Every structure is written in structure tokens, then in C-alpha cells.
Amino acid sequence: MENQEKPLSVDEEYDLWKSNVPLMYDFVSETRLTWPSLTVQWLPTPVQELDGGFIKQELIIGTHTSGEEENYLKFAEINLPKEILSNEDPQEEAGEEYQSSLPAPRSNIRITAKYEHEEEITRARYMPQDPNIVATINGQGTVFLYSRSEGLQSTLKFHKDNGYALSFSTLVKGRLLSGSDDHTVALWEVGSGGDPTKPVRTWNDLHSDIINDNKWHNFNKDLFGTVSEDSLLKINDVRANNTTIDTVKCPQPFNTLAFSHHSSNLLAAAGMDSYVYLYDLRNMKEPLHHMSGHEDAVNNLEFSTHVDGVVVSSGSDNRLMMWDLKQIGAEQTPDDAEDGVPELIMVHAGHRSSVNDFDLNPQIPWLVASAEEENILQVWKCSHSLPIVGGPPKVNKDIIS
């Protein structure tokens, strides 16, 4: 017993991670926010090179002040070294000052606009067909529509309790799903010219407990998935009278789900038991596979839009994990097996509290923004030297203006 290693404290784990930053990352920025943000999303900002060799990207964040101050929906920008586009090493290009900053991640986030918001923002998501429009949901389940340039536009009331589920369709302009702790799901049409403040359809019987997440399918405009505290995963069709076309009984409640951007049949879901499950929509009776690595509940999932088969997850264990589904079943040496399953390609251990939300940049492969409970927002890109899917992904430099 005396020889047993004492587990590292959270601060010791952070210091260990920080010492490995130059080896594992091309870029890291860390910002301490005044208040924690429960939500983060990249805006689809065109990649433009600025004076000084930087590129600008933009983010949506919120505040959770616990009633102590006014809450705000915020828009932020960050300047990134242009070398991350070509998978070069920014440390080599930016000189001594940048090299010395990597072990102690610096902040270069700047708030460019903010709008007052009724209560905390649990989720904020932009409309894919019009990124000037942003939907939010708060701790009372009220949905709001904001214009980036003009502020609050509409208040959408239906839910009676806290909501975390919010999803715009990538296929139909203005088609918005919201879900709440009151067990209900609502469909809003906010881009059709009608009254956006009244739901076009609501569901009170999809689930018998809290709606943890809902997401639209990326290939079929009428399909959406829901997960709930009732331990059910449901695939639903807005055209069907009974709506639900498939139901999965989960081992424990799922907190999150995500549909692939590359395969119309692939779905991932995860929750309280810490595993990430993969399903084929053509046969949902049993999962295709489950991936182990997290040590606590998984709260968010996202498929890469750039690389087929890459999934990212985040959890209450303060970790984000990148998975390569093409590596499932790959042979490992005993030493490699001790580090994790073969499909686990990257662990981001830079957070010291539960990860509230994260997002993969739609323009720049492997660039991630992640927000944690303890007021920290990080922007990071894993090293191009890591053995990631198909070698380093390329960015089309024609998009740089």
C-alpha cells in the first residue's frame, strides 16, 4: 500500500498538461471569463489573413451569473497564427515570444458585441443559412432570437422549465428544435416569414422525463433524434403521425447525441455511464460499438465535418476526447493498450472542471473551442505531428482572401 502512487490533484494534472502543451498542440489560448459560459459555438467566419500574419475567427458565448448580475449573449473574436491553416508549426514561425507563451497558454479573446439576456444562456446556436440570426434558450425554457447586428428580435414561449436542447436544421432554413426539462419538444419555423413566436408543432409524449438533447439529421430534413432522462433514445420523423420511428432503451440515460456529416446511417450517443455508443440507423436494436475512455458522464458529442469517422466528446471528467472510428479493432502493443483503446487518438486534459460545451471550427480542421464550469474558455488545435486520421488534413488556401 505504501508504494501505491497517490492520484494527482486537479491542479497537478493541469500543470502536467501545461508542460506537455508544446508537444501536443499547434496552438492554445486560455481565457478566464468574468462568468462561466454554458455554451460556445464558432461562427462560420471566412478565413482572412490580417496584418501581422494572423487570421480572425469568431465565437458565440453566454453568461451564467446565478442572478448576481445581468446576463449577456456575447460575440467574441480571436486572432490565430496563419500557420495553423497549413499545419506548420506556429512556434517556429512566431519567434521566442510565442514559444515562451505555449507552456502558459495566453488569452487573445476579445468581446466585440454583447446583448442583455433574460436569465442564463444554457445554449446558443446560429442559423446555418443565416449566421446573423442566433437562437438561445434559458433556464426557464424560453427561446430567444437575436440578430448579431441589432440584438433581441423575438421571444418564443412554450416550455415551462429549464432547457438545454436546441438545434437548427442544416437543411431547412429557420427550422429550429427545442427541448426542455418539462419533457416537451417544440418545432419552430423562424425563417419562413410566418409568426416565429408560435411553435408549428409540439410534442408532450415523446419522453416521460427531462429532454437532454435533440438534433436534426444531416441528410434527411424530416428526421431528428432525442435523448432523455427516461433512458430512451428516439429517432423521430416530423411527417409521421406517431412521430417516433425507432426507440432504443439505453443502459443509462444519454445526455447527448450527434449525427454524422458523412454517413446518413451513423449516429453517436453518450451519457451517464461514460461510454460513447455508435448506432446504425438501419438497425438500432444493438449498438455497433461502444468506446471507453471517459471516467465520468459524457455531456457533449460532435462529428467532424472535415474528416469522416472522427468524433469528439466532452464530459464531467474535465476531458475532451477525439476518436477515429477507422481505428476500431486495430492491433496495439501492450504499452499502447495501457494508454487507451486504439480509436482514442487525442485527450485534451487542459480543463480543471467539467466541460460545459465545445465546438469544432467549421473552417479550420482540428481547431476546437471548449468552455468549462470554472469560467475558463480555451481555444486549441492539436499538433499536426500527431498520428491523426489520414495524416494532417489540408485547408483549401483558395478560401483565404
Curated annotation (Swiss-Prot):
UniProt induction comment: Repressed in presence of farnesol, probably through a intracellular decrease of diacylglycerol.
Record-linked SUPFAM superfamilies: WD40 repeat-like
Site (described: Important for interaction with HAT1): 266
One Pfam entry name: CAF1C_H4-bd
Listed GO biological process terms: chromatin organization; chromatin remodeling; regulation of DNA-templated transcription; subtelomeric heterochromatin formation
WD-type repeats, residues: 116-147, 158-189, 206-237, 249-280, 293-324, 350-381
Outcome of mutating residue 266 to E: Abolishes interaction with HAT1
Presence of the UniProt keyword Chaperone in the record: no
SMART domains xrefs: WD40
Gene Ontology cellular-component annotations: chromosome, telomeric region; cytoplasm; histone acetyltransferase complex; nucleus; Rpd3L complex; Rpd3L-Expanded complex
GO molecular function: histone binding
Localisation per UniProt entry: Cytoplasm; Nucleus
InterPro entries: Histone-bd_RBBP4-like_N, WD40/YVTN_repeat-like_dom_sf, WD40_repeat_CS, WD40_repeat_dom_sf, WD40_rpt, WD_repeat_RBAP46/RBAP48/MSI1
Record's subunit section: Component of the HAT-B complex composed of at least HAT1 and HAT2. In the cytoplasm, this complex binds to the histone H4 tail. In the nucleus, the HAT-B complex has an additional component, the histone H3/H4 chaperone HIF1.
Family: Belongs to the WD repeat RBAP46/RBAP48/MSI1 family.
Function as written in the Swiss-Prot or TrEMBL entry: Regulatory subunit of the histone acetylase B (HAT-B) complex. The complex acetylates 'Lys-12' of histone H4 which is required for telomeric silencing. HAT2 is required for high affinity binding of the acetyltransferase to histone H4, for the nuclear location of HAT1 and for the HAT1-HIF1 interaction. Alone, it is unable to bind to H4, requiring HAT1 for high affinity interaction with the histone tail. HAT2 also has a HAT1 independent function in life-span regulation.
Stated name of the protein: Histone acetyltransferase type B subunit 2
Species in which this protein is naturally found: Saccharomyces cerevisiae (strain ATCC 204508 / S288c)
